[in-house]
A protein has these predicted regions:
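Terminal peptide-recognition signature
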Residues: 124, 149, 157-160, 189, ...
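PDZ-domain C-terminal substructure recognizer with occasional recognition of PDZ-binding tails
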Residues: 127, 175-218, 310-336
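Hydrophobic membrane-insertion alpha-helices, especially the h-region
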Residues: 6-25
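Short, glycine/polar-rich helix-capping loops at beta-to-alpha or helix-loop-helix junctions
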Residues: 299-311
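Short, ordered loop/turn segments at secondary-structure junctions
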Residues: 164-166, 194, 271, 302-305, ...
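Glycine- and Gly-Pro-enriched alpha-helical subdomains that act as flexible
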Residues: 253-258, 265, 271-302
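PDZ/PDZ-like peptide-tail recognition elements
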Residues: 33-57, 66-70, 91-144, 201-267
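Conserved PDZ fold ligand-binding element
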Residues: 149-173, 177, 287, 294-298
Length: 337
């Protein structure tokens, strides 16, 4: 082959390899969208501990909480889908307009704390243990970007205790205190921020129908008082969807795990302090995670049953529940069927 043809061929090969490498690199680059990927459900034993609880007997059964791995999807995945039972989630479906990933992480931490409080109340009360829920302050779970408080140093998850030295423990008390201050007036807030008590100064804003607002979405922060102490040891997991699992662990530990009859019970679902189970995201991926640990039963919110069954292998029985009591009954039925 003439020398110039060899050089031309080599140049063509190099160009093809370089182009292919560039395309491959581009496809593996992160997109702005997210991927939900299945994770094996995790045991609640060791995560939730009740004072005085005994070690579960062998073959007693176990409760598992289901989680979903969340990461940025690659460009390839936005075109061709997420492998191994994963799901592509558009950016706008996970983040609100103007919300950063750091904001979402803080909200997920707040939601996890709230789920633990609800689980403690529901689980202990189901055991007949007295529980008192004491209002503590007003937690910030949303901030209007254009409101003065957005540039005051306050962050999502902060808890407001005082408005101009007036103690506030509920959202109603916050509204009353702000009404006293008046609209578009300076106001001093004492709040729990980054583990410390801090004082900041901001301005109120006019709300609808003559109301006075801070420009935040408030949620009541509470203190749980009970003679039976419950502790949680968990890192790297956020969100509200483990509430049902945590309550079941508290109840099962209190019953010596006899209520499980040897079953592996995986669960997902938000939980209110009244025992209502609410919907969650990623039910299909969580069903796969339940199967990975050999779960006999997968309890999900009623609103997520179809999605969970679509993702669950035949080896896992999926049951929808509306309340914590429903969950206990579902476990009992599974042991007698």
């Amino acid at each position: 082959m003439p020398r110039f043809l060899r050089l031309l061929l080599i140049s063509a090969v190099i160009a093809a390899v370089a182009t292919g490498g560039l395309v491959l690199w581009s496809l593996q680059a992160e997109s702005s969208d997210f991927a939900f990927v299945p994770r094996a459900a995790a045991p609640t034993l060791g995560v939730v501990t009740i004072a005085g609880q005994a070690e579960p007997p062998k073959d007693a059964g176990a409760v598992y909480f289901s989680t979903v791995g969340v990461r940025h999807a690659t460009v390839f995945e936005t075109w061709f889908g997420v492998a191994d039972g994963g799901e592509l989630v558009p950016n706008h479906a996970l983040l609100e307009p103007g919300e950063s990933e750091a904001d979402r992480a803080r909200l997920d931490t707040v939601a996890m704390d709230s789920s633990q409080d609800a689980a403690t109340v529901v689980g202990l009360r189901a055991l007949g243990v007295p529980v008192t829920v004491k209002p503590e302050g007003v937690r910030i779970v949303g901030i209007e970007p254009k409101a003065p408080i957005a540039s005051s140093g306050a962050e999502l998850g902060d808890i407001i205790f005082n408005v101009d030295k007036q103690r506030v423990t509920t959202t109603d008390a916050l509204r009353a205190a702000l009404k006293t201050v008046g609209a578009e007036r300076p106001v001093t807030l004492t709040l729990h921020h980054s583990g410390e008590m801090e004082t900041i100064t901001t301005r109120t804003i006019k709300g609808p129908k003559g109301t006075v607002m801070l420009g935040v979405v408030p949620s009541e922060a509470t203190m749980i008082l009970s003679p039976r102490k419950v502790t949680f040891t968990l890192q790297g997991v956020g969100g509200p969807s483990a509430g049902l699992a945590f309550a079941l662990q508290i109840y099962s530990a209190g019953k010596g795990y006899a209520n499980l009859h040897g079953l592996k019970v995986a669960t997902t679902g938000t939980l209110s302090m009244e025992g209502t189970v609410g919907p969650i995201g990623g039910a299909g991926e969580k069903a796969i995670g339940a199967a990975r640990v050999g779960a006999d039963l997968f309890l999900v919110p009623m609103a997520n049953v179809a999605e969970a069954r679509a993702g669950a292998p035949k080896s896992v029985e999926v049951v929808g529940v509306k309340t914590f009591t429903d969950a206990l009954r579902a476990i009992e039925r599974a042991t007698t069927s």
